[in-house]
């Protein structure tokens, strides 16, 4: 639901300038704080939520206008007019990896009160039939009882393989409040639980904070700082991992044509990382990296949608159908190195 406040384009420029200053400040302040972060820790938290946003190249931080806002930008929960359930299932890389997402979001607060929103979300990533080859025998050329590569040769006996599974879970508890008409602030608390086979497990805790501005003439802008506390993941082996903060800013512009039968939305997200992943990013300045996520969405009578975008360097596209209160969305995600994947999600608005 868009605010009825009549903001001018000048107000939008002011907000955009402020968001830009936040990016620059974070670029100088955050890197020293995350120097001890573990690269790729908590990677499953980055898979995404909802085929609608994914079909737009994940350009959703500046839009965040449905129940998946709890994942993309929790500040958007304050703009929800009605409760909503969202669910998504995906299988990636030849069905090796399975991913599930489920959320319930609802507005709170009565007439005359500041709009607020609550949500609970569950994310799961699982990999089955992982071969554990640690029990295999080998020819010990050095006689030291240790497998030395490449001198020693492994004796592969598939009958001795032990198959395990890995499961990663995350529970998000999210809250948002409208500070004044058109501007909302929100946050999420995250609880992470991971298992690898029967012997390895970990627990983790973290938090996200986001802001969303909704103006007139179809403009909106938002920002989210994920893992603001540097999410800690503690393994039962005594090993500790940490997920470094990432800053993501976004803006969106919607325009309606012909009695609002046709609505086109253009969106752009920019993700700023501080973990020095230069090889996997599109641009970098020192240890600060940048990814760009442009996206488009077209609605016909708010019943049929077509989408396209770029998820960093990977092409994305999708479609959606709304029938009364029920919706189904599909997303196609290309990958420059691995197989493409398909996402299907469903939503119900009460």
Predicted regions, residues:
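Polar/charged alpha-helical tracts
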Residues: 14-17, 142
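Subset of outer-membrane beta-barrel
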Residues: 37-350
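N-terminal secretory signal peptides that target proteins for export/translocation
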Residues: 1-15
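Selective for proline/serine-rich intrinsically disordered segments
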Residues: 7, 29-30, 72, 292
